[in-house]
């Protein structure tokens, strides 16, 4: 059953007294020795990688499980994203409905249903709506408002020894802010992928495309008549194959092609090929390859070569040493860059960026007496990377950034009743130094989480997230602070009727600490969601 971030702090404290998205993240696991999967060229640049702590009751995860994605600026409390109805495989239910509300206006509605659900066919539809409204803590009490929704359809069809995956969605959103007035967006996506096995060869072929339209808007505080409509059109294809050489090794190749056409801008493209060799032994798994990208259209160097290397050494079940180096070109779709905040306007095409190298080395120790520990060091360089910029008509600007980043993680679990985890990450931060996926140029990121399960069906948690040294680049090459994020949140959920009805609530930014998302756009104060989930 899908877990929720839940009950208001007062309710949580009352419960604990009687008995004794946190930011959402998405984990994408790619095992190149089984199902090769190239990095998505349209990957949201507004997300930053975050180390996932090993679960204390399990062996150390494979290298692909060490990274997840979490949001930089949690402006509101969205429900879990709907792409597939969030039902456990063992559930006899075929649909769900989530509804959450928090005054004065934070609203979340999520629903999904599996129309067909058998061994060969799974056809699902789902939808989601998120909305919020709040006033900035300034002299004018500026109003910030957002409403957005999407509907999805997903098909997973087994055909022979292969699978056909088809996805379609439509989306709409609109926002208003004091800094950027208002803008609306409408768009849709269609993709299909086929993967199958033929003898010793496993292969995959896919196509995808989307269209997004952004309406006219006028920057606040300017005399401009307004910027005209802008449309993003994108298409792509990818293919991959891997062949087994012997019991321990495989060889493979991945091919991708993406293009992006934006109104009044040159059509851009990236064509890439990634050959690699993968090897698995008793205590070691790894692969060695290179991503060779050719850019089409637009200025700049068109040919780039980046490493595609990963390895994990596990001499025992309590220790793992891992290494990863990657990179490549990517197209900057407006939809992905607005993941930083939906209040960011779309004005012009954002071009193409390149990551020559993003390398990480680290280790994990544990679980030892239910305690796990990890550490890593990383270095990365990015060119023409779109970073927030303090100008009303240019909210993003291409920049070349490099940075060294290091972090520590720790976790402890006592049976199934108590789990505690913490992390601390630090990176170089200045006008020219920044971790490229931290668009707020933070210099420190600290987080902690406490989970308690005192009764069957009752889950309580508390979280703290800190992002320090946040800043934005200004005209003239200097930076201005955006304010530190200090976010304390708490919640709980309770299964009123097992596998049928849950109630949940969550509160975020309990201390109501404000900070800037962009120049002139302030975060929301105390907020959350109170609601329920119904399975049917």
Q: Can you name each region flagged by the protein language model?
A:
Residues 111-115, 151-157, 188-196, 237-243, ...:
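Residues on the lipid-exposed face of transmembrane beta-strands in outer-membrane beta-barrel proteins
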Residues 335-352, 381-402, 427-449, 461-495, ...:
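Outer-membrane beta-barrel domain signature, especially the mid-to-C-terminal portions
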């Amino acid at each position: 059953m899908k877990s929720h971030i839940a009950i208001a702090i007062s309710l949580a404290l009352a419960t604990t007294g009687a008995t004794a998205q946190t930011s959402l993240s998405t984990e994408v696991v790619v095992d190149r020795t089984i199902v090769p999967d190239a990095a998505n060229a349209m990957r949201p640049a507004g997300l930053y990688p975050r180390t996932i702590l090993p679960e204390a009751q399990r062996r150390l995860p494979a290298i692909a499980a060490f990274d997840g994605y979490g949001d930089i600026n949690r402006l509101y409390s969205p429900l879990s994203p709907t792409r597939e109805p969030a039902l456990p495989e063992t559930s006899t239910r075929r649909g769900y409905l989530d509804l959450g509300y928090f005054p004065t206006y934070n609203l979340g509605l999520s629903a999904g249903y599996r129309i067909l659900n058998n061994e060969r066919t799974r056809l699902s539809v789902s939808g989601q709506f998120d909305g919020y409204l709040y006033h900035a803590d300034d002299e004018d009490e500026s109003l910030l408002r957002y409403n957005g929704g999407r509907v999805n359809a997903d098909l997973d069809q087994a055909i022979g020894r292969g699978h056909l995956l088809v996805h379609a969605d439509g989306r709409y959103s609109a926002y208003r802010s004091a800094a950027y007035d208002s803008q609306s967006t409408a768009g849709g996506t269609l993709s299909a992928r086929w993967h199958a096995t033929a003898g010793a060869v496993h292969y995959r072929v896919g196509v995808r495309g989307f269209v997004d339209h952004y309406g006219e808007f006028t920057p606040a505080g300017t005399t401009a008549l307004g910027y005209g409509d802008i449309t993003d059109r994108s298409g792509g294809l990818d293919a991959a194959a891997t062949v087994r050489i012997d019991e321990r090794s495989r060889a493979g190749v991945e091919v991708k092609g993406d293009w992006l056409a934006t109104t009044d801008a040159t059509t851009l493209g990236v064509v890439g090929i990634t050959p690699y060799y993968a090897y698995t032994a008793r205590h070691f798994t790894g692969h060695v390859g290179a991503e060779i990208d050719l850019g089409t259209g637009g200025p700049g160097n068109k040919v780039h070569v980046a490493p595609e290397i990963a390895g994990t050494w596990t001499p025992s079940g309590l220790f793992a040493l891992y290494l990863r180096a990657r990179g490549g070109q990517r197209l900057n779709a407006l939809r992905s860059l607005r993941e930083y905040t939906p209040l960011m306007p779309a004005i012009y095409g954002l071009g193409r960026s390149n990551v020559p190298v993003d390398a990480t080395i680290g280790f994990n120790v544990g679980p030892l007496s239910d305690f796990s520990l990890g550490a890593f060091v990383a270095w990365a360089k990015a060119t023409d990377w779109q970073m927030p910029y303090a100008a009303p008509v240019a909210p993003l600007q291409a920049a070349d950034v490099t940075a060294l980043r290091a972090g520590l993680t720790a976790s402890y679990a006592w049976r199934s009743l108590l789990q505690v985890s913490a992390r601390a990450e630090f990176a170089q931060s200045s006008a020219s130094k920044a971790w490229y996926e931290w668009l707020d140029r933070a210099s420190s990121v600290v987080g902690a989480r406490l989970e308690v399960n005192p009764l069957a069906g009752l889950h309580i948690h508390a979280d703290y997230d800190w992002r320090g040294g946040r800043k934005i680049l200004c005209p003239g090459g200097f930076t201005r602070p955006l304010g530190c994020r200090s976010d304390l949140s708490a919640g709980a959920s309770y299964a009123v009727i097992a596998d049928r009805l849950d109630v949940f609530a969550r509160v975020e930014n309990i201390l109501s600490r404000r900070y800037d998302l962009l120049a002139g756009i302030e975060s929301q104060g105390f907020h959350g969601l109170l609601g329920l989930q119904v399975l049917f």
